[in-house]
């Protein structure tokens, strides 16, 4: 049996999912948290049972070693030879990587060079890649980029109206993120609609603590709300989304903060947390709003308002929409936010059933049968997309 492992390495964490391929059956999944701290947490699910241990895991290499040992100890695999492919999520591929790629030394160098575009994520992704290569050097490794799917955007979508030399010299442009998720739900939507993705106009709403909207026409990303970084676009859990750029020097002058500190505020203290003053967690805000907290209600309204702006502009951009898709933590689970987003879209031909909307995390249509525009909840599955790309590249390598 051939097995592929999908890896998402963060600065202090390592998420994994092991697949039997090509059947795409999930064998096990888990996460190593608090890597580098004394009380690291190792969690793995075996035969439906979640096993949690608190152990000292000083670095990613030890985390990988431990993960592989646990797979043997729990009899998930008989030997390391059963793992025939490793897929790594990499946040930023820039223009260099328009698609997933076989990892060699040059690819690692290129990903490291792109770290200035994603300083929080790419270095951690590379650490994960190197740790696996050291322990399983002969297994096919593949990098799957969050930005790759959006590389089909036309220049009018990705260029900022800045001096063109900034794009040529520094790579300043819109890149977009959550690409693996947008790609998965768009392909799955086509399956559910029974139509080729090539003839569909889709609006995909990846709404989680980080959130982005994408306009997908003919299976290709035409535009997306995140920009040069994942800070742009709609209001999010702790991120501001789009603001007037002149606010940055203004805030610096008023508060005495450095540019770096203001950026920190925009990334970590803004969005729903900033407006509400309570929490970045949507569930807390829904509870508070229900109790009559005006600021919690306002934070939710701002979130929905920004989503509406993208839905309207992207519908115009594609000259219509065939389906709106909700995915990720909020999109899949919050009937409240879906209702607020869908209300007022009747002019576009969106007719949805409030009774169908009362679900959490399951794949289903929310529209009435006669609705010209379909509305679908599709739980995202980035790990499966990673495993599929590994399979494709492994078979062609």
Swiss-Prot record:
Provide the residue positions that the database annotates as binding Mg(2+). 8, 382
CDD domains on file: ASKHA_NBD_AcK_PK
Q: What is its main location?
A: cytoplasm
Question: Which residue ranges does UniProt annotate as crossing the membrane?
Answer: none
Cysteine pairs forming cystine bridges in this chain are: none
Q: Name one GO molecular function term.
A: ATP binding
Catalytic residues per the record?
146
The cofactors named for this UniProt entry are: Mg(2+); Mn(2+)
Query: Site: Transition state stabilizer. Where?
Result: 178, 239
Q: Give, as in the UniProt entry, the pathway in which the protein acts.
A: Metabolic intermediate biosynthesis; acetyl-CoA biosynthesis; acetyl-CoA from acetate: step 1/2
Q: How is the cofactor bound?
A: Mg(2+). Can also accept Mn(2+).
Q: Which UniProt keywords apply?
A: ATP-binding, Cytoplasm, Kinase, Magnesium, Metal-binding, Nucleotide-binding, Transferase
Q: Name one GO cellular component term.
A: cytoplasm
Subcellular location per UniProt equals: Cytoplasm
UniProt binding sites for substrate: 89
- Cross-referenced InterPro entries, in alphabetical order? Ac/propionate_kinase (IPR004372), Aliphatic_acid_kin_short-chain (IPR000890), Aliphatic_acid_kinase_CS (IPR023865), ATPase_NBD (IPR043129)
Q: What class of enzyme is it?
A: transferase
Quote any Pfam family the record assigns: Acetate_kinase
Q: Which residues bind ATP?
A: 15, 206-210, 281-283, 329-333
- HAMAP family, per the entry: Acetate_kinase
Hey, which family's this protein in? Belongs to the acetokinase family.
Subunit structure, interactors included: Homodimer.
Q: Which PANTHER family match?
A: ACETATE KINASE, ACETATE KINASE-RELATED
The UniProt function text for this chain reads: Catalyzes the formation of acetyl phosphate from acetate and ATP. Can also catalyze the reverse reaction.
Protein's name according to its UniProt entry: Acetate kinase 2
């Amino acid at each position: 049996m051939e097995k592929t492992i999908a890896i998402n390495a963060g600065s202090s964490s390592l998420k994994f999912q092991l697949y039997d391929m090509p059947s795409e059956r999930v064998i096990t999944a888990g996460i190593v948290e608090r890597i580098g701290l004394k009380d690291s947490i190792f969690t793995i699910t075996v035969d439906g049972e979640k096993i949690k241990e608190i152990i000292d895991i000083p670095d990613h290499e030890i985390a990988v070693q431990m993960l592989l040992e646990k797979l043997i100890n729990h009899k998930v695999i008989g030997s390391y030879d059963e793992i025939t492919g490793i897929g790594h999520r990499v946040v930023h591929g820039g223009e260099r990587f328009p698609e997933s790629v076989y990892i060699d030394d040059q690819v690692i160098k290129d990903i490291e060079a792109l770290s200035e575009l994603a300083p929080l994520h790419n270095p951690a992704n590379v650490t994960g890649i190197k740790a696996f290569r050291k322990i399983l050097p002969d297994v096919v490794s593949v990098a799957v980029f969050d930005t790759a799917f959006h590389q089909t955007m036309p220049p009018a979508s990705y260029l900022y109206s800045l001096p063109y030399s900034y794009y040529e010299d520094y790579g300043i442009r819109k890149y977009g993120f959550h690409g693996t998720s947008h790609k998965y739900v768009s392909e799955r939507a086509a399956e559910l609609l029974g139509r080729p993705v090539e003839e569909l106009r889709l609006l995909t709403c990846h709404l989680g603590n980080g959130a982005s909207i994408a306009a997908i026409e003919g299976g290709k990303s035409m535009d997306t709300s995140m920009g040069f970084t994942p800070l742009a676009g709609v209001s999010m859990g702790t991120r501001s989304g789009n603001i007037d750029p002149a606010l940055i020097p203004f805030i610096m002058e008023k508060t005495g903060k450095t540019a770096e500190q203001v950026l920190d505020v925009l990334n970590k203290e803004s969005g729903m947390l900033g407006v509400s003053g309570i929490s970045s967690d949507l569930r807390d805000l829904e509870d508070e709003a229900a109790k009559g907290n005006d600021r919690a209600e306002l934070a939710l309204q701002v979130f929905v308002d920004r989503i509406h702006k993208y839905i309207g502009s992207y519908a115009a951009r594609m000259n219509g929409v065939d389906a709106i898709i909700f995915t990720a933590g909020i999109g899949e689970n919050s009937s409240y936010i879906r209702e607020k987003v869908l209300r007022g879209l009747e002019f576009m031909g969106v007719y949805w059933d409030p009774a169908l909307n009362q679900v959490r995390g399951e794949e289903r249509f929310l529209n009435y049968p006669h609705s010209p525009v379909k509305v679908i909840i599709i739980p995202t599955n980035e790990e499966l997309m990673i495993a599929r790309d590994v399979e494709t590249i492994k078979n062609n390598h």
